[in-house]
Design a protein with these regions (language model features):
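Hydrophobic ligand-binding cavity/cleft-lining segments
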Residues: 4-76
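Extracytoplasmic/periplasmic/luminal assembly and interaction segments
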Residues: 52-101, 151-152
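Short, highly charged C-terminal tails/helix-capping segments
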Residues: 71, 174-189
Length: 189
């Protein structure tokens, strides 16, 4: 009787594992998370807040994950070539961002590398499109959907998880940009 139960349990585990693996391989090879908001400010008021990593602490939800994380800035002061690295024992992990393209005031493209808690290499992109007296501001992240990401996608809705952070960040940017005109350097720590 115990032998039969053990066999049934093993078979159920194998079938469950096979099901998870089949679901994982059926997931797309790339991912994209994107959120958009409308900001009552011109692109040239929003752009400096994004193109200068020193000012991200004023609006990025990721900056609040671990106030004690180590931050390093290198490369250009802002815009193309600016580099921001972080190292955290907490939720923020360890990673690096480098602005690879920043045609003012329409777009900022960032090479985004995570090293901890898992390694991944993606692209983050901010687009600023004037729409009359407002700016349509889009924050996107995209890249390869590796096998571990496909498996995680079965159990967690990554779009909702990351998208919620993007919505918070965009709302913070909107609030900052709709205030009096500011210079991103005034918000530096």
């Amino acid at each position: 009787m115990i032998k039969t139960i053990a066999i049934v349990v093993v078979v159920l585990l194998v079938v469950s594992l096979a099901g998870v693996l089949l679901l994982a391989v059926s997931k797309p090879d790339t991912f994209r998370v994107q959120r958009t908001t409308s900001v009552k400010a011109p692109p040239d008021r929003i752009f400096p807040l994004i193109a200068d990593f020193h000012g991200w602490s004023a609006w990025s939800p990721y900056e609040k994950l671990d106030p004690a994380m180590k931050r390093t800035f290198s490369g250009a002061d802002k815009g193309k070539g600016a580099v921001y690295e972080w190292d955290s024992d907490g939720k923020a992990g360890k990673g690096r961002m480098e602005i690879t393209d920043a045609p003012a005031p329409s777009k900022v493209t960032i090479k985004l590398d995570f090293f901890k808690p898992f390694e991944s290499h993606n692209t983050a992109e901010f687009k600023l499109e004037p729409r009359g007296d407002t700016t349509e501001l889009t924050w996107a992240m995209y890249g390869p959907n590796l096998f571990i990401g496909k498996v995680m996608g079965i159990f967690f809705d990554m779009d909702k998880m990351i998208g919620k952070d993007f919505e918070t960040g965009l709302a913070n940017l909107k609030t900052l940009a709709e205030q009096k005109p500011i210079d991103a350097t005034t918000s530096r720590r």
